[in-house]
């Protein structure tokens, strides 16, 4: 494993500025790691020529002495982000061969800050999944293993490639997106830090849409400080996205003091689930004690509508997806099915979508179309929207009562084996989002921080939920938790 590729963003920034290393050396080290890690299935489109050109430009900026924090930092980009001239398929066969003519706002801001793109990362198809098993490229694999077993484990989803690449030190950090937990759950499964910002903090323009009222881009990094640095480059108002907030972007890194004395941390009783593993329960209690020892006040809180969050999410998200995915018709871009003589436009739509969309995407399109249909709109979709408003109100009331952040588990288990859920009811897979979906429904910021290992040696994470637009405060609380937890474990290299 290259010493350079295992650097954090902050450490690499300091070495680059001190001229101890060059962006080109750092990029070459990461490209070599990517080249040797095919077994992880993390990178699906490599861009070495682009990376070298960007690194050269970064070195010139560094020499001139006015380089931003992200200058020369090699990243992986989730395949959901449109990257100009580089395949951007959302891990779906229906977008086979699609190379956008434009750059997403988030990636263009990262590149403007001098970041280097090593390539595109694996994910669940259209970000629909919790295990990276719905990808047209095949599975991404978790670099961690259970004890002495060689069972291939999931890196989580949908940002599974991002999680795997960062945990295996193939890149210094990666972009992710989070619709119901797709940054936080994989981050917890691989022992890295993942931040879902407040809805509207990062532009959605140029990110392939899943559920437009829930999707949000965020950083997946090796520690909390790196999350703060990378979020600063990703965030900001974008007139091309009507949901993007016209708010200044603070210096998130400068807010990392680690001082949380007097902060009130809420512990929601509704997150104590039946059948929750004892290890998760114990980790949660330990995390609460760590924050209390750091000077925070713990307060038991209630979020009474939590139990309705998953059903509401799995009505709203597929409904929005069925609308968004209607644009994939074989006419404008991507895959078009071969037609038989006499086939008309209806057959073209049917065959193209049958060939192009995977089973999970088809399932969600059908659920979404069903809940939006005339006879069921009020019974399902409208009711789910009302539940969403109640969930948001629960959080508003807790924050209004003086709570600064809420501590919960990030996931209901450690990483499971690839294929282990295949025979299960799809709802079993959906339960992976049980601790994370409320954050998306309420539009709040949430961060997963690695906090320990289970008895099989797999990472477990805790989640902190913050007030809207107060990512700096949330990151500082996460920083205090990270320091107290002292998580430094790395996977043993087998790939």
From Swiss-Prot:
The active site is at 78 (charge relay system), 158 (charge relay system), 182 (acyl-ester intermediate). The keyword Ligase applies. Belongs to the amidase family. GatA subfamily. It is an enzyme of class 6 (ligase). Heterotrimer of A, B and C subunits. It comes from the Bacteria. The lineage of its organism: Bacteria, Pseudomonadati, Pseudomonadota, Alphaproteobacteria, Rhodobacterales. Its EC number is 6.3.5.7. GO terms for molecular function: ATP binding; glutaminyl-tRNA synthase (glutamine-hydrolyzing) activity. This is Glutamyl-tRNA(Gln) amidotransferase subunit A. It comes from Dinoroseobacter shibae (strain DSM 16493 / NCIMB 14021 / DFL 12). Coiled coil: none annotated. It catalyses: L-glutamyl-tRNA(Gln) + L-glutamine + ATP + H2O = L-glutaminyl-tRNA(Gln) + L-glutamate + ADP + phosphate + H(+). GO terms for biological process: translation.
